[in-house]
From Swiss-Prot:
Protein's organism: Methylacidiphilum infernorum (isolate V4)
Positions contributing to substrate binding: T26, G27, I28, G29, K30, T31
Subunit structure: Monomer.
SUPFAM superfamilies xref list: P-loop containing nucleoside triphosphate hydrolases
Enzyme class of the recorded protein, top EC level: transferase
UniProt keyword annotations, A-Z: ATP-binding, Magnesium, Nucleotide-binding, Transferase, tRNA processing
UniProt entry tagged with the keyword Transferase: yes
GO BP, sorted A to Z: tRNA modification
EC identifiers of the protein: 2.5.1.75
Protein name: tRNA dimethylallyltransferase
Stretches for region Interaction with substrate tRNA: 49-52
One GO molecular-function entry: ATP binding
Cited function: Catalyzes the transfer of a dimethylallyl group onto the adenine at position 37 in tRNAs that read codons beginning with uridine, leading to the formation of N6-(dimethylallyl)adenosine (i(6)A).
């Protein structure tokens, strides 16, 4: 109850402040576009990437460089140790502090990333469902997706049509909530807190499928060139292979197995990571399609990308001029 009151107070304090969103699936080019927008209009950047919150997961999560983090006054990065747990509520708490600091300095914020849950938490509120049951979650994480789906169907059939059943983590959460509280996650979702920011502008960028796939493959190769294997080896030396296998960021577990067991050759390893990231990108698109506040832009060529950036800058500048003349831009 205390958390609910605090969240309500925060939402009231943050009403009518300049915040904007640029979202899209992994590898689509969000960060580069966000930097171009920020250069033109002087915005600070908040990462809404669910993996960039973890320290030491740098290359595999495509974090901005240290110089870029300083230049664009980044928030939402390196919030917790890579072995720690993190969730949307903790992210919103951190985002509150960051936004308050930037707004105090009269700077607008562009939130950029691909985590649909973080976007929803900031713009539509948080679900008040019970926290994670670690003992039950450990048990469920040992099961494959089909077994999890059968269990959810048995205990909460109404949730099956609602939950993203291609994502084991979503199935686990639905099972966990139902078995812990006796109430379906669907019912809990109806009892959300107030949104963190309102009003806001939100842009969803996408690429034609062939180009998106090429970009994703190129991105993975560049990560290996930058030292992804060496980064993973450092994590294994620090926390052991068991900790790396529990890491939720795509690629680290596969690379760890490759380094220690040589299960695949390098090409097979890159292809396995690509398949996982491609599947994640599809799930991201599915999520964003359910967000009515997003303005969708398909960037078919460099000219359309340029026009999008120009239009985005104009819309943001107009929004600030109309509502926040005391803010910098």
């Amino acid at each position: 109850m205390v958390q609910d009151i605090k969240r309500a107070e925060i939402a009231l304090d943050f009403k009518n402040k300049p915040v904007f969103f640029l979202v899209g699936s992994t590898g689509i080019g969000k960060t580069a576009i966000a930097h171009r927008i920020a250069d033109e209009i002087g915005l600070s950047l908040l990462s809404i990437d669910s993996m960039q919150v973890y320290r030491k997961l740098d290359i595999g999560t495509a974090k901005p460089s240290l110089s870029e983090r300083i230049r664009y006054r980044y928030g939402g990065i390196d919030l917790v140790d890579w072995k720690d747990s993190f969730n949307a509520f903790l992210f919103v708490q951190q985002a509150c502090h960051y936004l308050a600091k930037e707004w105090e300095n009269r700077r607008g914020v562009l939130a950029v990333g691909g985590c649909g849950l973080y976007f929803r938490a900031m713009t539509r509120g948080l679900c008040n469902a019970p926290p994670a049951n670690l003992q039950l979650r450990t048990e469920l994480e040992k099961m494959d997706r089909i077994t999890l789906l059968e269990r959810l169907t048995r205990i909460d059939p109404s949730a099956v049509a609602w939950v993203d059943c291609s994502n084991p983590r979503r199935i686990i959460r639905a099972i966990e909530v139902k078995e812990t509280s006796g109430i379906s996650l669907i019912e809990w979702q109806k009892k959300t807190t107030l949104p963190l920011v309102t009003p806001f502008l939100a842009f969803w960028i996408d690429r034609p499928q062939p180009e998106a796939e090429i970009r994703l493959r190129r991105r993975i190769k560049k990560m290996f060139e930058r030292g992804w294997e060496e980064e993973t080896l450092m994590l294994i030396e620090e926390g052991g292979m068991e900790a790396v296998e529990k890491c939720k960021a795509i690629g680290y577990k596969l690379i760890g197995q490759f380094l220690l067991q040589k299960r695949k050759n390098r090409e097979e390893l890159e292809e396995a990571i690509y398949r996982q990231q491609h599947g994640y990108a599809k799930r991201q698109k599915t999520w964003f399609k359910k967000e009515p506040s997003l303005c969708y832009y398909l960037l078919k060529n460099p000219e359309e990308e340029y026009r999008f950036i120009k239009s985005c800058i104009e819309k943001i500048a107009f929004f600030i001029r109309r509502n926040h003349q005391d803010f910098l831009y």
